[in-house]
Design a protein with these regions (language model features):
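N-terminal active-site beta-alpha-beta segment that forms phosphate/nucleotide-binding
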Residues: 2-101, 106
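An acidic, phosphate/nucleotide-engaging active-site surface
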Residues: 83-149
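Conserved small/polar residues in nucleotide/adenosyl-binding loops
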Residues: 150-155
Length: 155
C-alpha cells in the first residue's frame, strides 16, 4: 500500500514541538512556505531554532516567527532587510550564527547526506574563521564547517 505524502494542516500542526529545529526554504519574501509558517504559528511551538537563508522582510515569512517571539536562535546568511531581527540579535533576545550562503547550503546538504561537514576556503582570514577548526590538505588550509542536523543543539 502506497502511503500518501499529503498531510492536512492539522496533521502538520501536531508535529511541531517546543525546541525544534526547522529548516525553512525561500529567500527574502520569495518562495517562502507561507502555509507551513502559519502552521508553526498555529502550533504554539516556542524556543525554535530556524535554519533559513534570511529572516524575510517584516510581516512576511520567517519574520512572522521572529515577531511572535517563537525563535530563540537562527542559523542564517544575513538578516539585513529586517530591522526587528537585527534589534533582537543586538539585544541578545535572539542568538544568530551567520554563514556565507554557499557554506550554509553545503552544511545543510552534508547533514542530509550523513557527512560530518565540509572543507572550504570561504571565510579563511575573516570573522567566519573564528572558533572553527582549520585543516590542512595537500599544503592548503581549509575551514571545517560542520554539518547542520535537525537534532543538533541551538547555536
Amino acid at each position: 500500500m502506497k502511503l500518501s505524502k499529503v498531510r492536512t494542516a492539522e496533521e502538520i500542526i501536531a508535529r511541531f514541538k517546543d525546541g525544534q529545529i526547522i529548516a525553512i526554504g525561500g529567500q527574502t519574501n520569495q518562495y517562502m512556505p507561507d502555509r507551513l509558517i502559519d502552521c508553526v504559528l498555529e502550533s504554539g511551538a516556542r524556543h525554535l531554532t530556524i535554519y533559513s537563508i534570511d529572516s524575510s522582510d517584516p510581516g512576511h515569512g520567517v519574520s512572522l516567527l521572529v515577531e511572535a517571539g517563537r525563535v530563540d536562535a537562527m542559523i542564517t546568511t544575513h538578516v539585513g532587510t529586517n530591522p526587528l531581527t537585527n534589534a533582537k540579535i543586538q539585544s541578545g533576545a535572539l542568538k544568530a550564527e551567520f554563514n556565507p550562503m554557499g557554506t550554509f547550503i553545503e552544511r545543510i546538504r552534508c547533514g542530509g547526506a550523513g557527512l560530518g561537514g565540509v572543507l572550504t576556503k570561504t571565510g579563511l582570514g575573516t570573522v567566519v574563521e573564528e572558533g572553527k577548526q582549520i585543516i590542512e590538505v595537500n599544503g592548503e588550509s581549509y575551514l571545517l564547517e560542520t554539518c547542520l542536523l535537525y537534532t543538533s543543539p541551538s547555536p
